[in-house]
A protein has these predicted regions:
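N-terminal "domain-start" segment
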Residues: 1-21
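Short acidic/polar alpha-helix capping motifs at helix-coil junctions
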Residues: 121-124, 137
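Acetyl-CoA-dependent GNAT
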Residues: 37-44
């Protein structure tokens, strides 16, 4: 990530406390092993984000609505599954979406996540009631994770 991207993606997440950072300790040393950030987007901000995520979000966008999008997820392979499960416990009442990070290779995709207190039926209803209004929506493939 270029240094100027920090202002678009890292600093707003820190400013609004919309991130989770996981640590691992061996008794002597503590090291970060996983990070996730999210934005709470309005339908309009979501549409702009899905149409061109590379443009980033404005500060106002980060807390503009109730559509939760994972903007950054970083976890080494050995920690990714455990971290995803921990997030479902840490954020148990929420439904999240994320753009697939290899969209250029496999096509644009949206992944869906839910907290552990959200049933699959509740999650489907949540997402159905908040459809993605992006212009290139027809090019997206949905994957429930």
């Amino acid at each position: 990530m270029p240094l100027n991207a920090l202002a678009l993606w890292l600093l707003p997440a820190l400013q609004f406390k919309q991130f989770v950072l996981a640590y691992e300790t061996d008794g002597l040393h503590t090291k970060p092993v996983a990070y996730m950030a999210w934005a709470q987007l309005s339908a309009q901000a979501e549409s702009r984000y899905v149409n061109n995520a590379a443009l980033g979000l404005t500060l106002k966008d980060w807390q503009s609505g109730e559509r939760f999008w994972i903007t950054d997820f970083c976890a080494p392979y050995e920690h990714a599954s455990d971290f995803a499960q921990a997030l479902a416990t840490t954020l148990p009442e929420f439904c999240f979406r994320s753009l697939y990070h290899r969209g250029a290779e496999r096509g644009m995709r949206v992944h869906y996540f839910r907290g552990k207190h959200v049933t699959p039926e509740q999650a489907k209803r949540w997402w159905r009631d908040r459809p993605i209004l992006a212009h290139n929506r027809t090019e997206l493939k949905d994957e429930v994770v």
